[in-house]
Amino acid sequence: MIFDEDVKFCASLLQKSDPQRFRSIMAAPEKLRPYYFVIFAFNVEISRAPYITKEPMIAEIRLQWWLDVLDEIIGEIAVRKHSVATPLSKYIGKIQAKELKVLVNARRWDVYSNKFKDFSELKKYLFDTTVILFRVAAGCESGKYEKDFQNACMAIALANYLMATPGLKKAGKVPISGLPTNEIEEQCK
């Protein structure tokens, strides 16, 4: 299958930034790969926005830029030219764009060094940043297996979050109050 330049860029971005996910996508049916490359490249762009600068305002501007892209998709307005935004507008519709806005807004937590007040706040963050992403990627809507799907995604989200704990601490974040981060850090080595 021949991919256009934007999809190739998304695949390359994913290969560099999230090699495990890139390899997983390479195991997917060939006709689905462009869609997955674009969705998960979007996630790379969103998830790294707060970490490429120490200035919260710049991170907020980057996240707002993506919210504006999603608003353009929702409003069926021509999306600005960008190697991830342009193909994203080809692969998702209004419903998915609205869901992805929740994901982008959840990433605002990453901009600041605030801690989660309790586990329910962490669960909401994990839901908004992972379950929504996988639901959009899978093309799922509420259905017979929605709860099972959500539970599987939450397990993935929590495992990834715990593995990221050492990096979060290094970046000055407080992953969650009362969480034994030193123990988790040792287990992740």
What name fits each language-model region?
Residues M1-K189:
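Acidic catalytic motifs of isoprenoid enzymes
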